[in-house]
A protein has these predicted regions:
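HIT superfamily nucleotide-processing domains
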Residues: 1-115
């Protein structure tokens, strides 16, 4: 199964399981979004699957609907926060060399700062 697993060493899995605190802004059965603890913009949230998948490189065909749902949640949050017109950034880092600090696939939604 590659990087798909439940792990006690993952801070994002701990947040999903409510073992670690976070300011949750969205949650459904498969996806969670919460504010980044080190925001790089006035709006900076992380959108992630509750299922532990380490990186994009660990995705399998069965994860296609789940990854599509990440984008739909980001779209929903952008509309909710009225940032659709001004624009926003969606960012995914892959591996340490790509800037990924937590081994749990996640998308950054950022807005409110000029890039």
């Amino acid at each position: 199964m590659g990087g798909v697993r439940e792990t006690m060493a993952c801070i994002f899995c701990d947040i999903v399981a409510r073992r670690a605190p976070a300011t949750i802004v969205y949650e459904d059965d498969e996806i969670m979004a919460f504010k980044d603890i080190h925001p790089q913009a006035p709006i900076h949230v992380l959108v992630l699957p509750k299922l532990h998948i380490a990186t994009v490189n660990d995705l399998e065909e069965q994860h296609i609907p789940l990854m599509g749902q990440l984008f739909m949640v980001a779209k929903h949050l952008a509309a909710q926060w009225n940032i659709v017109r001004q624009g926003y950034r969606l960012r995914v880092h892959v591996g340490r060399g790509g800037g990924q600090l937590i081994d749990h696939i996640h998308m950054h939604l950022l807005s409110g700062r000029n890039y």
